[in-house]
Amino acid sequence: EPGYQIPFRHLCNYVQIYSGDTEKVLSRLSDATESQKERLRVRIECAKAWLRDYAPEEFKFSLQTENDALYEANENEIKAIRDFCGYVENYLDKMDEREFSNYIYQAASDNGLENADFFRVIYTVLIGKEKGPKLAGFVKACGSETIVPILKRY
């Protein structure tokens, strides 16, 4: 049986999204067979080691929690965050990342924000950094159940 196909970078993102919890990472890869999951466990351990020992700082992230300080957003940014939250709630789990990316740009343009500024705001809100993994894919990997509570803080 062939190994489960997931790019190492994506696997590293899952490891960070789920704070290194191997079983939660595997639960997101629900189409993997049991034998593939055994091999994935080894790859997950390799990803953890790479993140710990070799990953550049800009590659590392952790999702914000209720204990983290809120980003000081202006009125338009708050409206854009709330619009984006609505799009995540209503559409994220119903479409692929390419389709969903249109809603990212819509949340920015509907609130008078340049795309680059909106991306900076959303990354800061989600991971406390101005840049991060490709946004649509990252949000899709996290899932609405993870992203919505963070966005609803605003």
Task: Locate predicted features.
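Feature 926 captures the class I aminoacyl-tRNA synthetase adenylation module centered on the KMSKS loop
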Residues: 1-95, 99-111, 118, 152
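Amphipathic alpha-helical/coiled-coil segments positioned at domain termini
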Residues: 105, 111-150
